[in-house]
Amino acid sequence: MLGRIVVGVALLCVVVGAPARAEYAEEAFFGKPNPSYRIPTPDGSGLSPIIGEVQIYRVRKGDTLMDLARLYSLGYNEIVEANPEIDPWVPPVGATVLLPTQWILPCCTYNGVVVNIPEMRLFYYQPQGDGTTIVHTYPVGLGRDEWRTPAGSFRISGKTVNPTWNIPASIRAEHIRERGDYRTSIPGGDPDNPLGKYRFELTMPMYRIHGTNIPWGVGMQVSHGCIRLYPEDIERLFPLVPVGTPGQFIYQTV
């Protein structure tokens, strides 16, 4: 953990109720709790607060780990790593699923948007002016090995609702080669548009933070380098983050 001192090392587990399978319509995900936490503002001392608490879930008929991950603001990587013996598509009814909804904040002093690449998780720090900071955290999907998301600093340079995807030449060549798709752009609102409904433009050329049309890809390396969030998470984050907000892509193991 890079020599970090951890505040609040006690592991807390909460048993959560099992909602009916019918609640996993798209509306259920947009109604889930927002993972936000108030902490003392980081001061660069090396202290890394823990936010959240581990939860336990009992599987019901029809559940998948993908649905549970999305419902509890986890990525595919997080829920599968926490439950290696459970079939992610057909978990046994009554099985105990560990929901790793507790996170060590990246070290040390950050402001704005921070994406920890190895963790596949975004943190948005909002200082409150009273010595505290509200931290919002969401799982993300990242670039594939051949399109790896780089480390670096940036600022939010723009925000777009229903963005058109102007397909870069390199990606278009891949689409032509793999599936004979010759489109040069996909308009906003089209179900084939991988940007989803919201997009943050960055000062880091060629990279963006946006939604997705494939929610199960959150917690996987499936993009061409951009950062993907669940549709409901980007919808919550979008109005909170103003243009000009600083950000970083970092590599810190946890």
Question: Locations of the language-model features?
Answer:
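Bacterial N-terminal signal peptides
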Residues: V6-V15
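Sec/Tat signal peptide C-region and signal peptidase I cleavage site
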Residues: A18-A22
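Primarily a LysM-type cell-wall glycan-binding module
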Residues: F29-S73
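N-terminal post-signal-peptidase region of extra-cytosolic proteins
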Residues: V54, N77-E85, T96-N111, H136-G143, ...
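LysM (lysin motif) carbohydrate-binding repeats in extracellular/periplasmic proteins that recognize
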Residues: R60-V90, G131-I134
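Loop/turn positions that initiate beta-strands
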Residues: G62, P92-V97, G244-G247
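Gly/Pro-biased beta-strand-loop elements
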Residues: P106-N213
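N-terminal targeting pre-sequences for secretion and organelle import
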Residues: E235-V254
